[in-house]
Amino acid sequence: MQTYGNPDVTYGWWAGNSRVTNRAGKFIAAHAGHTGLISFAAGASTLWELARFDPSIAMGHQSSIFLAHLASIGIGFDDAGVWTGANVASVAIVHIIASLVYAGGALSHSLLFDGDLADGPGPTTQKFKLEWDNPDNLTFILGHHLIFFGVACIAFVEWARIHGIYDPAIGAVRQVEYNLNLTNIWNHQFDFLAIDNLEDVLGGHAFLAFVEITGGAFHIATKQVGEYTEFKGAGILSAEAVLSFSLAGIGWMAIVAAFWCATNTTVYPEPWFGEPLALKFGISPYWIDTVEVSESTALAGHTTRAALTNVHYYFGFFFLQGHLWHAIRALGFDFRRVTNAVAGLDRAQITLND
């Protein structure tokens, strides 16, 4: 984190990431703990939505975000193809049990294992130490992350191919073979909001899996070419810089997801998420429902699509502000100068020379 040259800098309790900045073991513990929280929230929220689900009202009008996502990937349907919530409780309970496993892993890494992997038990462990101004170290860790993302894409593609996912074009769950047409994949970079068939959606995921796993292997196996210069980030690459990159990525993905969710009914089927939205502008952009949802059981009476879209957009917006904040700090700007300048306005004096 940015210390402005102070080797003994301290952070408030709210700056939780600061205590794991240079300690990869603690960083892993934090990752596992966060994953456990997410898994528990997903499982518990799914059970809550299932308990309050009213089959007489469209799912998209009940703000059932977790149920809607499960229905989209073909979970919860009976043998007749009707969504009844079958097996949904089992999925939720598995997530809750998994959260306990993640919590155990977090506590183990936090309390029992080395906080700094540079002192780890073997050379393999030590490769994952955190050296923020060492591009070879960071690219090695990045490579493993990319491979995990690629494996997740493969899992989704295979799930759709073997089990099947919901296709709004026919109103039923079906098995989907991915379309690995590179021309379509390239063109969908620019019109992805208009994708209207699942084959192209799965083809994009299959292509991403290849790119991410190939890129991951490349980053693990290679080191930088030539001297590590300022042009390549020397003196700038830091924990704060990497944090800013991460915030930019997740912020951009959230905003893209908001636009996609607002209008696309192939990836976000209308029966589960509600009708497409209309974009409006006030103090900031926002999306509103285009149909009457007076029977909605959701808080404030909106569709699932409206809730999901607006929350994604505003989270994405604030993540991007966080990106700018941390990126500017990583470049060396001291925001305390702004605070001091504002605080000194009442003491400022203007001298006019003849």
From Swiss-Prot:
Subunit annotation: The antenna complex consists of divinyl chlorophylls (a and b) and divinyl chlorophyll a/b binding proteins and binds more divinyl chlorophyll b than does the antenna complex from high-light-adapted Prochlorococcus.
Miscellaneous remark of the record: This low-light-adapted strain contains 7 pcb genes.
Main subcellular localisation: membrane
Topology in membrane: Multi-pass membrane protein
Cofactors that this protein relies on: divinyl chlorophyll a; divinyl chlorophyll b
Pfam families associated with the record: PSII (PF00421)
Top-rank taxon: Bacteria
Family from the record: Belongs to the PsbB/PsbC family. IsiA/Pcb subfamily.
Record's keyword terms, sorted: Chlorophyll, Chromophore, Membrane, Photosynthesis, Photosystem I, Photosystem II, Thylakoid, Transmembrane, Transmembrane helix
NCBIfam families on file: PS_antenn_a_b
Source organism of this protein record: Prochlorococcus marinus (strain NATL2A)
Name the UniProt record assigns to this protein: Divinyl chlorophyll a/b light-harvesting protein PcbG
Cited function: The antenna complex functions as a light receptor, it captures and delivers excitation energy to photosystems II and I. The Prochlorales pcb genes are not related to higher plant LHCs.
GO cellular component terms, A-Z: photosystem I; photosystem II; plasma membrane-derived thylakoid membrane
InterPro entries: PS_antenna-like, PS_II_antenna-like_sf
Single GO molecular function: chlorophyll binding
Membrane-spanning residues: 27-47, 65-85, 88-108, 201-221, 241-261, 308-328
Gene Ontology biological process terms in this record: photosynthetic electron transport chain
Compartments in which it is found: Cellular thylakoid membrane
